[in-house]
């Protein structure tokens, strides 16, 4: 009702008990008379129209106007009243005809009484007794006490109430069935839709099952008690048990899809899309769990920096989450290029393994599931392109072409000064914010003498000239100022700051003071390692700065072009074949690249001459096969591609001749200086790295076959190179390709030239 039924009017209070003599026919007549006396344009509230009703005109038989009015008030209390009187009378007529229909079914005098639950039986039995013992208690307090007493009852006493309830419940069900037979017109069976029931989620299936089990043990439990008891159990289920319900839910969904498609064919008027039928009942976590048990591989980190962070964070559980990424970034910067390269190779290997495992996983899936997994992989790749991590941003920018991008303005002298001094100020004044730090640096710049400013202005001029000389296709942002060199104390602090922050509960000021005291009390012998690292960092800074001032090497003409389907160059001699075999089986992966090459040279010296001949024959056979495949591939090219390939080979030979000059050693030095300018390229491909190793193997192998000490030669060459094999892969590819072309003309020419190169190296040393 709308609330008015709870506040009886004076007429309702005065209703005589004799009103019971109204029959159904009399009440319908009353309503008909009222309907006939309504105004033609009845649009007012029913109370307004009711107050203007002439009840004497409504009176009929021996029912007076007042009696009719009282009866109307009684009937109108049974229906909602926020409508016009015309509408209200129609509803009242329906109520008079079927007073016990629908929700009012239980009000029928013959309707069987529902049995009390075991708890209510106990409550009704004990309430009077406890009310006498505790008259000061309210009904709420009594209910709480009796509820607690019932829970404390032994099972034997509880069983008495449970058995009485079950007996009366069976009797109630029999009486209800009899009532339905006797009064079929009163049962309002809502016409149920014949649309198939939607499939349940794994959690819903589990809850339905567990609820039945729970009610068998505690039949008197309320719905709230069942929910409270089972609510948290689903999240605590083991993966194996959760998987059981996931499989059941998937089976149910499959059945639903088949039934639903048949239903849609029979009812084409329904507007149900295919997406609505095939909608998954699994959550993201449940889907991932199923995929994991089906053998779907875990996606590896996207780049070497992410891989390093993932490994480092596993041991940083005590460090606050806000500090972890900062520490990871600092530790990453402390790694040498060789260590970063190792992580890059490891990351690339994980990606390759993932692709192989993913293909194997896809083969085991039906076509629909394959499409789903491929769709998820595609979305992940799209998201990666849209949001790049700080670690992956730099390589992607370096590897991209700059022709379509707007060139950046070179940095100013003041900016160079600020970047150089900012880190030192941050350590000395950690309480300053970024904006305060910037203002302080600006004041310091203004206070500098013109002589000191001239040094930074010279750098600015060099960077500006560099920017003007920079070609459109050159690698991105050579004019960026290199990172300032760190002092020994700064490098040490970055390596231990995590421990100090944990000790001082993330209080950075206290941690910095403690680190400063520890550093001052350290012996020189303990500081020596950090002093060496600082010296290396200073050399790195000076080298990068000199590279920025130097004009960029012209690499566009010698940049390796990729031709689809071009056969890969095989080893050119026995030593290179031997090296490739050792490198590919992973036996030496634990060694750094420099030591790895020395070890390969040493092993080559130890094997017998017959084994060397065996590797030489294998290499010669692969060279013959390569020539055949290369000829077939060149013939298969279109005329335009063939012409482009020949032009590329011709230009490459000319460029390599210019770069190498008469002395092979000087050419290698030239290439090395060029490669040093791009040593931070973290996104080089692993195949190019292998070719770089093969190039060194080739030189070492030739010298070994000529009787030279391969390991010694390799060590000397690498020590002269100076940067632990951080050669640019593209340049190494060019050397490989040049050797490859020359080898097509004469198999032994490359070997002899390499031998002469090594001999000259040895002579110069």
Curated annotation (Swiss-Prot):
Alphabetical keyword list? Acetylation, Activator, DNA-binding, Nucleus, Phosphoprotein, Repeat, Transcription, Transcription regulation
Question: Disulfide connectivity?
Answer: none
Which GO biological process annotations does it have? cellular response to leukemia inhibitory factor; positive regulation of transcription by RNA polymerase I; rDNA heterochromatin formation; transcription elongation by RNA polymerase I; transcription initiation at RNA polymerase I promoter
Locations of Basic and acidic residues compositional bias?
A: 370-379, 457-487
Post-translational modification Phosphothreonine, affected residues: 201
Short name of any one Pfam family annotated for the protein: HMG_box_2
Region annotated Disordered sits at: 1-21, 370-411, 456-487, 546-576, 649-765
Return the Polar residues bias intervals: 664-674
Q: Phosphoserine: which positions carry it? A: 273, 336, 364, 389, 412, 433, 435, 484, 495, 546, 584, 638
Instruction: Spell out the post-translational modification annotation for this entry.
Output: Phosphorylated and activated by PIK3CA.
DNA-binding region(s): which residue ranges? 112-180, 196-264, 298-362, 407-475, 482-549, 568-634
What are the subcellular locations of this protein? Nucleus, Nucleolus
Cellular component (GO) terms are: nucleolus
Cell membrane as a keyword of this entry, yes or no, is no
Q: What SUPFAM superfamilies does this protein map onto?
A: HMG-box
Which residue windows does the record flag with biased composition (Acidic residues)? 677-746
Task: Describe the protein's quaternary organization and the partners it interacts with.
Answer: Homodimer. Part of Pol I pre-initiation complex (PIC), in which Pol I core assembles with RRN3 and promoter-bound UTBF and SL1/TIF-IB complex. Interacts with TOP2A in the context of Pol I complex. Interacts with TBP. Interacts with TAF1A. Interacts with RASL11A. Binds to IRS1 and PIK3CA. Interacts with DHX33. Interacts with PHF6. Interacts with CEBPA (isoform 1 and isoform 4). Interacts with DDX11. Interacts with NOP53. Interacts with ALKBH2.
Write out the function statement from the record: Recognizes the ribosomal RNA gene promoter and activates transcription mediated by RNA polymerase I through cooperative interactions with the transcription factor SL1/TIF-IB complex. It binds specifically to the upstream control element.
What is the protein name given in its UniProt record? Nucleolar transcription factor 1
> Mind giving the lineage of the organism this protein is from?
Eukaryota, Metazoa, Chordata, Craniata, Vertebrata
């Amino acid at each position: 009702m709308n609330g008015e039924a709870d506040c009886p009017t004076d007429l309702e209070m005065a209703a005589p008990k004799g009103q019971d003599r109204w029959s159904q026919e009399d009440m319908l007549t009353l309503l008909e008379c009222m309907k006939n006396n309504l105004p033609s344009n009845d649009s007012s509230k029913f109370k307004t129209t009711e107050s203007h009703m002439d009840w004497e005109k409504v009176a009929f038989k021996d029912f007076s106007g007042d009696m009719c009015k009282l009866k109307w008030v009684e009937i109108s209390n049974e229906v909602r009243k926020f409508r016009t009187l015309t509408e209200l009378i129609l509803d009242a007529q329906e109520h008079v005809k079927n007073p016990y229909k629908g929700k009012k079914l239980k009000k029928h005098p013959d309707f069987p009484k529902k049995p009390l639950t075991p708890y209510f039986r106990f409550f009704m039995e004990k309430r009077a007794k406890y009310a006498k013992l505790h008259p000061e208690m309210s009904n709420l307090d009594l209910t709480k006490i009796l509820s607690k007493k019932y829970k404390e009852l032994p099972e034997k006493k509880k069983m008495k109430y449970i058995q009485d309830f079950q007996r009366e419940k069976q009797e109630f069900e029999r009486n209800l069935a009899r009532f339905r037979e006797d009064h079929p017109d009163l049962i309002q069976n809502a016409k149920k839709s014949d649309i198939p029931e939607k499939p349940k989620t794994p959690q819903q299936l589990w809850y339905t099952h567990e609820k039945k089990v729970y009610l068998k043990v505690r039949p008197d439990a309320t719905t709230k008690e069942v929910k409270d008891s089972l609510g948290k159990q689903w999240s605590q289920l083991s993966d194996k048990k959760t998987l059981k319900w996931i499989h059941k839910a998937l089976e149910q969904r499959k059945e639903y899809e088949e039934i639903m498609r048949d239903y849609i064919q029979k009812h084409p008027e329904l507007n149900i899309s295919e997406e609505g039928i095939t909608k998954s009942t699994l959550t993201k976590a449940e889907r991932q769990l199923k995929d994991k048990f089906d053998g779907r591989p875990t996606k590896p980190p996207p780049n070497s920096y992410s891989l390093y962070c993932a490994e480092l964070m596993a041991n940083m559980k005590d460090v606050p989450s806000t500090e972890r990424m900062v520490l990871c970034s600092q530790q990453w910067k402390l790694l040498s290029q060789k260590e970063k390269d190792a992580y890059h190779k490891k990351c690339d290997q994980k990606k390759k393994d993932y692709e192989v495992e993913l293909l194997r996983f896809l083969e085991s899936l039906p076509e629909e599931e394959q499409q789903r997994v491929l769709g998820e992989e595609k979305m992940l790749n799209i998201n990666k392109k849209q949001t790049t991590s700080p670690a992956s941003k730099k390589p992607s920018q370096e590897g991209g072409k700059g022709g379509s991008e707007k060139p950046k303005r070179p940095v100013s002298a003041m900016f160079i000064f600020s970047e150089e001094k900012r880190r030192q100020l941050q350590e000395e004044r950690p309480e300053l914010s970024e904006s305060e730090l910037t203002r302080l640096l600006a004041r310091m710049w203004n206070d500098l003498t013109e002589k000191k400013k001239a040094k930074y202005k010279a750098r600015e001029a060099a960077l500006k000239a560099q920017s003007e000389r920079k070609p459109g296709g050159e690698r991105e942002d050579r004019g960026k100022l290199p990172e300032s060199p760190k002092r020994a104390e700064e490098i040490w602090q970055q390596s231990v700051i995590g421990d100090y922050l944990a000790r001082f509960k993330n209080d950075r000021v206290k941690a910095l003071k403690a680190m400063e005291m520890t550093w001052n009390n350290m012996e020189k012998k303990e500081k020596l390692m950090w002093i060496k690292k600082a010296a290396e960092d200073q050399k790195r800074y000076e080298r990068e700065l000199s590279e920025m001032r130097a004009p960029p090497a012209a690499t566009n003409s010698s940049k390796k072009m990729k031709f689809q389907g071009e056969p890969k160059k095989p080893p050119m001699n026995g030593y290179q074949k031997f090296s490739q075999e050792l490198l590919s089986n992973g036996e030496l992966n634990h060694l750094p690249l420099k030591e790895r090459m020395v070890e390969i040279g040493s092993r080559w010296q130890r094997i017998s001459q017959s084994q060397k001949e065996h590797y030489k024959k294998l290499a010669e056979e692969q060279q013959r096969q390569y020539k055949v495949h290369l000829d077939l591939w060149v013939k298969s090219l279109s005329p335009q591609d063939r012409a482009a390939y020949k032009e590329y080979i011709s230009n490459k030979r000319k460029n390599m001749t210019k770069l190498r000059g008469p002395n092979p050693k000087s050419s290698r030095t030239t290439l090395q200086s060029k490669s040093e300018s791009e040593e931070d390229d973290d996104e080089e491909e692993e195949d190019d790295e292998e070719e770089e190793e093969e190039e060194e193997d080739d030189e070492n192998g030739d010298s070994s076959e000529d009787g030279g000490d391969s390991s010694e030669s390799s060590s000397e060459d690498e020590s002269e190179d100076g940067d632990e094999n951080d050669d640019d892969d593209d340049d190494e590819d060019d050397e490989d390709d040049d050797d490859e072309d020359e080898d097509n003309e004469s198999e032994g020419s490359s070997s002899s030239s390499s031998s002469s190169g090594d001999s000259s190296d040895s002579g110069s040393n």
